[in-house]
Curated annotation (Swiss-Prot):
Entry's Gene Ontology BP terms: cell wall organization; cellulose biosynthetic process; plant-type primary cell wall biogenesis
Underlying gene: CSLE2
Keywords associated with the record: Cell wall biogenesis/degradation, Glycosyltransferase, Golgi apparatus, Membrane, Transferase, Transmembrane, Transmembrane helix
Bridged cysteine pairs (disulfide): none
Transmembrane feature ranges: 29-49, 66-86, 541-561, 568-588, 658-678, 686-706, 723-743
Name this protein carries in UniProt: Cellulose synthase-like protein E2
Length: 745
């Protein structure tokens, strides 16, 4: 069956010193961290003890008793989740590669060939110029072009995407030698010309401006074709590939197409300097309206099969179409892990972190990417397995295609597809491998390739690879390997997290649960690491409880925390101060500012009470066979005014959604409770009345402070990104009765 070419089982020889090093933090630093964590855990235990030993009596209406029990349940969960997160962070590791040793140990001819997969699905949502900038960036890797094979999967089967790829194949003849001659970084032409305003060292102004003009001309032609929707006659006459499209073609109903635009085996496939070009292949798998196509997972599996007959490289790298290569040496870095004879035999994939170029300083959405990349993921790596992101990942083909690791197995890095056929025959073979019926009654998507039947197919695929005995590696080089685009509106971000949360929750409730699938196969610490995300959804209810019930009790004068003068006040204060101080220190250590840390805390709260909550509801509705709630936003903010507001630190709302209603309701409720609660205490009891309600008052004030962008969007802003009046009206309908009942009580 297509997909892999087998390996060889034989002894190996160590070629000199190691190709990579694994480093751990200093003992003193880890000891200090663990002592700090131990003191916080002691505080958590004291909080649990206080809740259990000071349970209010059940007299009266029992409101305080029930509220107290709810606080106990929430704090039990927060404590458990904190311990889970802490356990994962117990043994971080950091990787360092030695590319100079790689060059000494392996000649260029001995290095393996690499198949690179780029996936796109919609030319409207993913503009063709964005796609080809990514394609050109990976075509220009600092690697032998004869050993590079780039495959573009176009699930829409769009003739526009094919036309743009044809344009890119011509531009590559100029761009690739320019990049290699002057060591250009990054090698996405769009990113390079946007960032660099002058020629690189050694390049004359005339040559640089000529290259820039070539790129501008291509961009103008592409944009003209995309805007008109019509393909010029010249490319149609000169490329046999265009003849496969007809008026009956749609994105959901079209035959399979495989076109080899550049064949590195042919003498004519050279750049302007006469050097070979990488192989470039366009693929659109067959689509039929009533046939399941499994989205991105199906696309990747189709690429695995097509590549197996054209190139069959032992290394596969896949990248999303909006995440270009920012480091031309990423392949060589990844090979340092795979080709190390002593340490690399069991490495199944090497995962690079996700980084984004459009995140501004003091980002209002507090993207925690630095902390995640610098702290969280190295800790997962320390337990023997970074998860598979779905992009920016180098795979061992054999591991991806289902091979179980054994110590006797040794990879044949020199193997390639045994090509005796010409391009036409290869294309015909490729088309037969990507029909709608090819996978019927096979193990594709079950035991082979990327997994089907789960929302986060990349995560479950990586987990299954690890359960087969393979190890994964996380590598975060100084110069980022890949750069992409992240959403810059609140709605887009919350929908994205809702999708991720649903996926992780469904994995946790299925046979793919790390504790079930990974039992006895991967370390307990790694199982817990996967579960940190798997339990995102569970955080929603305790968090929603904690930001509403204490505030309502404060408004009613019901105390849920110890007095400021009580000894029991100390563990509450210590846990809060110590935990947030540690979080701030970690954020600053990773290069974030204090403002970015504060914004990240806001988004942490917002995600828990919106994305996580609705993801949980939708997941259980699906389990019960009830239709989904339909809370997902579909509006995408792309206009220049919205981008300007983002750069100014203004949250982008702009449309009605259930998520915004929940967020606004919580914000208005706490504002009302703070104002009315403090007024009630001062008028009825004086300043001394706050002694018993001090922590609740602080909590209420903090929630109000963290929701300041919501109040700004409600009361001060009048732009298109502000909160709609309909959101405010619905929220007031929830808040007003609660406040009236409390006041009249």
């Amino acid at each position: 069956m297509a997909g892999s070419g087998g390996g060889v089982v034989s002894g190996g020889r160590q070629r000199g010193p190691p190709l990579f090093a694994t480093e751990k933090p200093g003992r003193m630093a880890m000891a200090a961290y663990r002592v700090s964590a131990a003191t916080v855990f002691a505080g958590v235990l004291l909080i649990w003890l206080y809740r259990a030993t000071h349970l209010p009596p059940g007299g009266g209406d029992g409101v305080r008793r029930w509220a107290w029990l709810g606080m106990l349940a929430a704090e039990l969960w927060f404590g458990f989740y904190w311990v889970l997160t802490l356990s994962v962070r117990w043994c971080p590791v950091y990787r360092r590669t030695f590319k100079d040793r790689l060059a000494q140990s392996y000649s260029e001819d001995e290095l393996p060939s690499v198949d690179i997969f780029v996936c796109t699905a919609d030319p409207t949502a993913e503009p063709p110029m964005l796609v080809i900038s990514t394609v050109l960036s990976v075509m220009a890797y600092d690697y032998l072009p004869e050993k590079l094979n780039i495959y573009l999967s176009d699930d829409a089967g769009s003739v526009l995407t094919f036309y743009v790829l044809c344009e890119a194949s011509e531009f590559a003849k100029h761009w690739i030698p320019f990049c290699k001659k002057y060591k250009v970084e990054p090698r996405s032409p769009a990113a390079y010309f946007a960032k660099v305003a002058s020629p690189p060292d050694g390049c004359g102004p005339k040559e640089w401006f000529t290259m820039k003009e070539l790129y501008k001309d291509m961009t103008d032609r592409v944009n003209s074709v995309v805007n008109s929707g019509r393909i010029p006659e010249v490319p149609r006459c000169h490329s046999r590939g265009f003849s496969q499209w007809n008026e009956n073609f749609t994105s959901s109903d079209h035959p399979s197409i495989v076109q080899i635009l550049i064949d590195s085996n042919k003498q004519k496939a050279v750049d302007i300097d006469g050097n070979a070009l990488p192989t470039l292949v366009y693929m659109a798998r067959e689509k039929k309206p009533q046939k399941q196509h499994h989205f991105k997972a199906g696309s990747l599996n189709a690429l695995i099969r097509v590549s197996s007959v054209i190139s069959n490289s032992p290394i596969i790298m896949n990248v999303d179409c909006d995440m270009y290569s920012n480091n031309s040496e990423s392949i060589r870095d990844a090979l340092c892990f795979f080709l190390d004879e002593e340490q690399g035999q069991d490495i199944g994939f090497v995962q690079y972190p996700q980084n984004f170029e459009n995140v501004v300083h003091n980002d209002i959405y507090g993207h925690p990417i630095n902390v995640v990349n610098e702290l969280d993921h190295p800790c997962l790596d320390g337990w023997g397995g970074m998860c598979y992101y779905g992009t920016g990942c180098f795979h061992r083909r054999e591991a991806l295609c289902g091979r179980i690791y054994s110590q006797e197995y040794k990879e044949d890095w020199t193997r390639v597809a045994g090509r005796t056929e010409d391009a036409n025959e290869l294309e015909e073979m490729g088309r037969s491998l990507v029909t709608c019926t090819y996978e019927h009654n096979t193990i594709w998507g079950i035991e082979k390739g990327v997994r089907y039947g789960c929302p986060l197919e990349d995560v479950t695929t990586g987990l299954q690879i690890q359960c087969r005995g393979w190890r994964s590696v996380y590598y975060n080089p100084k110069r980022k390997g890949f750069l992409g685009m992240t959403p810059t509106s609140l709605g887009q971000i919350l929908v994205l997290y809702k999708r991720w949360t649903e996926g992780f929750l469904q994995i946790s409730l299925s046979r793919y649960s790390p504790f079930l699938l990974g039992h006895g196969k991967i370390k307990l610490g790694l199982q817990m690491g996967y579960s940190v995300c798997g339990f995102w959804a569970v955080n929603s209810f305790p968090t929603l409880y904690y930001v509403t019930i204490p505030s309502l009790c404060f408004l009613n004068g019901i105390s849920l925390f110890p007095e400021k003068t009580s000894p029991w006040f100390i563990p509450f204060a210590y846990v809060m101060v110590a935990a947030y101080s540690c979080s701030l220190a970690e954020s600053l250590q990773c290069g974030d500012s204090a403002v970015e840390w504060w914004n990240a805390q806001r988004m942490w709260l917002i995600r828990r009470i919106t994305s996580y909550l609705l993801a949980t509801i939708d997941t259980f509705r699906r389990i019960l066979g009830i239709s989904e709630s339909g809370f997902n936003l579909t509006v995408k903010v792309t206009d220049l005014q919205a981008l300007e507001r983002y750069k100014k630190g203004m949250m982008e709302f702009g449309s009605f959604s259930a998520m915004f209603v929940i967020l606004t309701t919580v914000a208005l409720l706490n504002l009302a409770c703070m104002v009315l609660g403090i007024s009630r205490v001062l008028l009825q009891e004086g300043p001394g009345g706050l002694e018993t309600l001090f922590l609740q008052a602080v909590l209420c004030v903090l929630i109000v402070a963290i929701n300041s962008p919501v109040y700004e969007a409600l009361f001060l802003r009048r732009d298109k990104g502000s909160l709609p009046a309909s959101v405010a009206r619905v929220s007031i309908c929830f808040v007003l009765p609660l406040c009236i009942l409390s006041i009249c009580k």
